[in-house]
Amino acid sequence: MTQRTSPPFRADHVGSLLRPPAIKTAREQRARKEITDAALRAIEDREIEKAIARQEQIGLQLATDGEFRRSWWHFDFFRGLAGVTFYTTDHGIQFHGVQTKAETIKIDGKIGFSGHPMLDHFKFLKAHARVTPKMTIPAPSTLHFRQGRAAISQQIYPDLDAFFDDLANAYRAAIRAFHDAGCRYLQLDDTAWSMLCDPNERAQSKKRGDDPDSLPARYARLTNAALQAKPADMAITMHSCRGNFRSTFIASGGYDFVAEHLLGYTNFDGYFLEYDSDRAGGFEPLRFFPKGKKQLVLGLVTSKTGALENKDEIKRRIDEATKYVALDQLCLSPQCGFASTEEGNILADEEQWAKLRMIVEIAQEVWGLRKSCPSP
């Protein structure tokens, strides 16, 4: 096996990292108007530089900014699109035994993309990373699925086909903008595909006015329309998530309901799939993964708890997955980010880094890799 020189990498990670105490304190101070936006940004800059250096030091071939400038993994991007309004509601998103902050979005105008603060976030990352800078944004299907037809203005979009067309156009523009900014590794984070694997979530989708049975095909078309003009030198991956807030989850269920459309029909370069618990089901749905250049990133290491996995067990599961996908098409990562929201999961900072270090070590042992050394 050879070390991959293009994304995704044998040892990879989803993106978000636990927020350092300095950032949490600064955000609280900014909310109380005790410091300026510029002062907060300076603290974020400093902590992001530290996180980049730490990722490089443990041997990763990529670095993210940890999503340190975000409150939410998805809303912070969506609220920067034309036609999307962010607002406070009467309840948060319900996870297993806990709710998020009572904030959400609605579509009350025509969807569009014409610049975004996250372009500057990426430029800062690129300027300070000596390895491949990786940017993460939510997938277009996520904007639709979380609240469905009920959150999309009937006046603006009486026909949902027009909504999906505008959404795909907005993502094509976003992809071009990130590419122009120098991004060559972009990940679209997605909860829709995995939520559709849960019968309870499909029932909720129906209550919102959607037909869950038709959504896998609809989301495959939306994805491919968004990726239609993807530059040849840009790797775009997706991450499928069942919910990740304060170490809890929303959905359960194997990939059977969506595997053919997700793995067989969408034009991503790589797929990050959760496989850290029985809630994700078995590897059988991977039979739909095509042979060739695409990569499947096994999320076998949990980001929800601090206990370090047994390396031999992780290797055994990688070997089990090779019944369906060739080893040369597999990579390894945590199942999700460590902090999909600013609150973060319930584990220590050093436990997070120990997991990422272990992933690098396992990748070196399984694929026979040399430790990555960033260029000066």
Where do the model's predicted regions map?
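Domain-level signal for soluble alpha/beta catalytic cores
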Residues: 1-376
